[in-house]
């Protein structure tokens, strides 16, 4: 008998469970009677959760979703241990920030961003699909407002989130015949530690006072806009998971619903003008014009 065959609880897999949203959703699922495989590259934070909630509610598993071979190994582990081969929930939450001017993002930075934010989630869905179909389960993605609005200095991250939004929407259609729900949680401001700590490259075309000021305003965007506490976000999302409704997109987090309507009713040129002012790109523009004028004089 496998380790879980006597376990009547619903079973979930959560990636990126070592902090922020994934950590809080893991706890909220455990409170709602799930056994959660809490997956992340770092086991230490999740080990504390296993102690707090008990090993019959949270089981830490070391997993780097940017490595396809680790996902295949994890799938084999689940095949050997899931009761009746059923997985009730896959929460694709692991994420990689990438905050750079578009022209400064290196091949390595772009590749890592897409490996985690896109390819890793696609691989998880493919490798775990048989368990989810058997359970008539639910697949959830942590989407982002950045996948709807391309904020300055975040074009690579925005591209990765836009890609996973479209994947989720296609998957939502394709999984309906198999009675598997797919939820894309388009996420606004949430208090997490995902913010990119890497500095502006010295060779950047934005490496002058006004450019650095604009870049720094983008890096502090989340904490400057009253982000929703991660535990409050988790409670909302778990309600969505437990619901029987089947929308593909749900909007959660600070400003998420506001931006949803902004994108419908506000012309993009006007939104772009607002973003330019908010992130101080108007100052960059003025500084460059002044510099050019001085050259011409």
From Swiss-Prot:
pH-dependent activity: Optimum pH is 6.7-7.2.
Annotated GO biological process: phosphatidic acid biosynthetic process; triglyceride catabolic process
PROSITE patterns per the UniProt record, alphabetical: ADH_SHORT (PS00061)
Catalytic activities: a 1-acylglycerone 3-phosphate + NADPH + H(+) = a 1-acyl-sn-glycero-3-phosphate + NADP(+); 1-hexadecanoyl-sn-glycero-3-phosphate + NADP(+) = 1-hexadecanoylglycerone 3-phosphate + NADPH + H(+); a triacylglycerol + H2O = a diacylglycerol + a fatty acid + H(+); 1,2,3-tri-(9Z-octadecenoyl)-glycerol + H2O = di-(9Z)-octadecenoylglycerol + (9Z)-octadecenoate + H(+)
Molecular function (Gene Ontology), one example: triacylglycerol lipase activity
Primary subcellular site in the record, as a coarse category: other
InterPro entries on file: NAD(P)-bd_dom_sf (IPR036291), Sc_DH/Rdtase_CS (IPR020904), SDR_fam (IPR002347)
Pfam families found in the cross-reference section: adh_short
A GO CC annotation given for this chain: endoplasmic reticulum
Disruption phenotype: Reduces the activities of beta-1,3-glucan synthase and chitin synthase III, while increasing chitin synthase I and II activities. Shows altered cell wall composition as well as susceptibility towards cell wall inhibitors such as zymolyase, calcofluor white, and nikkomycin Z.
Active site: 18, 157, 161
Motif (GXSXG): 16-20
Keyword Endoplasmic reticulum carried by entry: yes
Thermal effects: Optimum temperature is 40 degrees Celsius. Thermostable for 10 minutes up to 45 degrees Celsius.
SUPFAM superfamilies associated with the record: NAD(P)-binding Rossmann-fold domains
Note: Present with 3671 molecules/cell in log phase SD medium.
Protein name (Swiss-Prot/TrEMBL): NADPH-dependent 1-acyldihydroxyacetone phosphate reductase
Binding site for NADP(+): 21, 64, 93, 126, 157, 161, 190, 192
Family: Belongs to the short-chain dehydrogenases/reductases (SDR) family.
Subcellular location: Lipid droplet; Mitochondrion outer membrane; Endoplasmic reticulum
Keyword annotations of the record: Endoplasmic reticulum, Hydrolase, Lipid degradation, Lipid droplet, Lipid metabolism, Membrane, Mitochondrion, Mitochondrion outer membrane, NADP, Oxidoreductase
The protein's Enzyme Commission number: 1.1.1.101, 3.1.1.3
Activity regulation description: Inhibited by divalent cations and N-ethylmaleimide. Activity is reduced under anaerobic growth conditions.
């Amino acid at each position: 008998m496998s380790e879980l065959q006597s376990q009547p609880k619903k079973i979930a897999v959560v990636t990126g469970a070592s902090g922020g949203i994934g950590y809080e959703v893991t706890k909220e699922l455990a409170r709602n009677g799930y056994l959660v495989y809490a997956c992340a590259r770092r086991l230490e934070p999740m080990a504390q959760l296993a102690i707090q909630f008990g090993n019959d509610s949270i089981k830490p598993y070391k997993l780097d979703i940017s490595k396809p071979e680790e996902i295949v190994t994890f799938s084999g582990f689940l095949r050997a241990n899931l009761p009746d081969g059923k997985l009730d929930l896959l929460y694709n939450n692991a994420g990689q920030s990438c905050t750079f001017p578009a022209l400064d993002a290196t091949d390595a930075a772009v590749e890592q961003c897409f490996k985690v934010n896109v390819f890793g989630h696609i691989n998880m869905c493919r490798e775990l699909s048989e368990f989810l179909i058997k359970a008539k389960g639910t697949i959830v993605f942590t989407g982002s407002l950045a996948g709807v609005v391309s904020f300055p200095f975040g074009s690579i991250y925005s591209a990765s989130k836009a890609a996973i939004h479209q994947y989720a929407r296609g998957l939502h259609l394709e999984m309906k015949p198999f009675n598997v729900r797919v939820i894309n949680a388009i996420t606004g401001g949430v208090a997490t530690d995902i913010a990119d700590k890497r500095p502006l490259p010295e060779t950047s075309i934005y490496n002058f006072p006004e450019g650095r000021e604009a870049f720094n305003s983008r890096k502090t965007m989340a904490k400057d806009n009253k982000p929703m506490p991660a535990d409050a976000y988790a409670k909302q999302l778990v309600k969505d998971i437990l619901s029987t409704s089947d929308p593909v997109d749900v909007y959660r987090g600070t400003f998420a619903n506001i931006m949803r309507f902004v994108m419908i009713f506000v012309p993009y040129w006007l939104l772009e003008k607002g973003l330019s002012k908010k992130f101080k790109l108007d100052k960059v523009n003025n500084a460059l014009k002044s510099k050019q004028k001085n050259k011409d004089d």
